[in-house]
């Protein structure tokens, strides 16, 4: 199958089906025209924000709760429920709370709620995936009704980002997941399993009354059906939950509109540096030079991505542009393979220079991307065996180091501490996410120094140097950062996407 056929076949089939379905029956829109219907892919795993960290649980929590701190447009930590954050010494952080903030049941937010939230996360009997983020926390105490003191075991410059966490009321127990109560712009009404989550406007929200009466998060697992409901007007908006081909087609519908913004989701090819072939940096650089990212972004991703140079996105305050960028250059890739000792033994003949295998999930869109990468590598002499798996099987193999290459994505990269978690030599499994077994003492030194640095300026300088070394070493083959995109009816106003595509903007959205 030729490249143009591969890139066009999917959306032709999809939209032929939609054409057939447009006369069918759908859920009727809400009776209240000032309630927004938002399309999501699945139900939440858990509405207790200390436990539920899947995408839909997280987005629902953004509407019901507030974080102690939040992230601004440059992914810097800034106050949310906090009035301010002070750091009088390297081991102490003092949070002063805003006054007059009400929970949905009417009681005022105090330091007791904050202390309870964090102590519950540290409680060995409380099972939470967030627990590991607070290993450096020695104690948390309420100094008074509106002041909380966090004491650390050791200096940790990224600690403030760990305060970007929803605050629950003091005493929230096991049943809290069934009727969550927060301080956010919307209060929980109901959850119909695998159908919808209903939220009502909270008129006493400290950040100002929401511009709409409420939200219905409609659970529609299928991309085609979400696109269809948008076209029919039974859904008002979908954010980042439509395939690029569907977004492209919906963009030509006069009743719909697109809003795009830079995102922080990072797609990459992971590399096993214990593999004798891939230990050679020149081979990794050759792979990076052989991939035609621009063609994949233009044709498969429909322009909804930008070329990535590393795990930190350009919107991050710590991002450094002064790093090596591997642009599509097959000739350079062949030269690098020559230098690595993998010479072309038969000129333009069929014999490959070397064989590698790539593991990936069995999602059809990923298969299409892999087929292009496979062809790119073939042209420079690398025979790539693409193997697809159910996600659970793929992930288990990655955790065990059972791979040469794999492709996954990091979602919501927001803090430069990701460099430590993914590339520091002390973060190899089971301690962290250094699943490719990368080891560079200078990168370790720079990351350690950044963690202990007193100012963001020092941290940015140190992280910038680490990014330069990582780009050259290529322990990951960077592919792209996804672009955030919201598709909505033209009656919808006020859509403003953040880098992490939080649902918080929905409080300012109106429908006319």
PLM feature segments, named:
Residues 201, 252, 278-375, 439, ...:
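Append "and occasionally in soluble cytosolic enzymes with long acidic Gly/Pro-rich linkers
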Residues 486-512:
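Long beta-strand-rich cores associated with HINT superfamily self-processing modules
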Residues 174, 202-248, 374-375, 383-385, ...:
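Ligand-site clamp/hinge motif
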Residues 86, 96, 129-171:
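Surface-exposed binding/hinge segments that line
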Residues 76, 155-156, 161-214, 222-225, ...:
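Gly/Pro-rich hinge or "lid" segments in bacterial periplasmic/extracellular proteins
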Residues 28, 340-413:
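Ligand/substrate-recognition segments at binding pockets and active sites
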């Amino acid at each position: 199958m030729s490249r143009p056929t591969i890139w066009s076949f999917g959306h032709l089939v999809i939209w032929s089906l939609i054409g057939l379905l447009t006369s069918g029956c759908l859920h009727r829109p809400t009776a209240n025209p000032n309630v927004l219907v938002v399309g999501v892919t699945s139900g939440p795993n858990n509405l207790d924000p200390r436990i539920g960290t899947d995408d839909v649980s997280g987005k629902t929590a953004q509407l019901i709760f507030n974080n102690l701190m939040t992230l601004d447009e440059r992914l810097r930590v800034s106050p949310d429920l906090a009035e301010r954050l002070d750091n009088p010494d390297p081991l102490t952080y003092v949070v002063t709370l805003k006054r007059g903030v009400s929970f949905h049941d009417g009681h005022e937010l105090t330091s007791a709620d904050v202390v309870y939230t964090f102590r519950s996360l540290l409680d060995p009997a409380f099972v939470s995936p967030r627990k590991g983020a607070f290993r450096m926390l020695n104690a948390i105490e309420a100094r008074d009704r509106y002041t909380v003191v966090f004491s650390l075991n050791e200096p940790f410059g990224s600690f403030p980002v760990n305060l970007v966490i929803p605050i629950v009321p003091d005493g929230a127990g096991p049943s809290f997941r069934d009727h969550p109560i927060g301080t956010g712009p919307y209060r929980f009404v109901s959850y119909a399993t695998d159908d919808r989550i209903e939220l009502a406007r909270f008129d006493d929200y400290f950040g100002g009354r929401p511009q709409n009466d409420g939200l219905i998060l409609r659970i529609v697992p299928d991309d085609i059906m979400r696109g269809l409901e948008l076209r029919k007007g039974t859904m008002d908006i979908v954010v980042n939950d439509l395939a690029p081909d569907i977004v492209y087609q919906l963009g030509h519908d006069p009743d719909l509109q697109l809003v795009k913004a830079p995102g922080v989701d990072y797609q990459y090819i992971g590399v096993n540096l214990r593999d004798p072939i891939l230990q050679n940096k020149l081979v990794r650089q050759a792979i990076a030079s052989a991939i035609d990212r621009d063609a994949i972004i233009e044709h498969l991703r429909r322009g909804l991505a930008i070329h990535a140079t590393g795990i930190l996105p350009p919107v991050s305050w710590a991002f450094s542009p002064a790093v090596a960028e591997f642009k599509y250059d097959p000739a350079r890739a062949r030269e690098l393979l020559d230098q690595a000792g993998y010479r072309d033994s038969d000129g333009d003949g069929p014999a490959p220079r070397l064989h590698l295998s790539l593991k990936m999930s069995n999602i059809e869109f990923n298969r299409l991307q892999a087929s292009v990468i496979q062809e790119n590598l073939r042209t420079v002499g690398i025979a790539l065996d693409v193997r697809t798996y159910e996600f659970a099987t793929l992930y288990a193999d990655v955790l065990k180091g059972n791979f040469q290459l794999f492709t996954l994505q990091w979602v919501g990269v927001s803090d430069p501490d990701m460099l430590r978690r993914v590339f520091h030599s002390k973060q190899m499994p089971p301690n962290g996410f250094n699943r490719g077994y990368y080891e560079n003492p200078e990168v370790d030194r720079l990351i350690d120094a950044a963690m202990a640095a007193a100012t963001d300026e020092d941290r940015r300088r140190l992280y910038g140097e680490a990014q330069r070394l990582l780009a050259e070493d290529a322990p990951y083959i960077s592919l792209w950062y996804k672009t955030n995109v919201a598709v909505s009816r033209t009656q919808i106003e006020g859509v403003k996407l953040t880098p992490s595509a939080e649902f918080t903007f929905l409080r300012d959205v109106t429908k006319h």
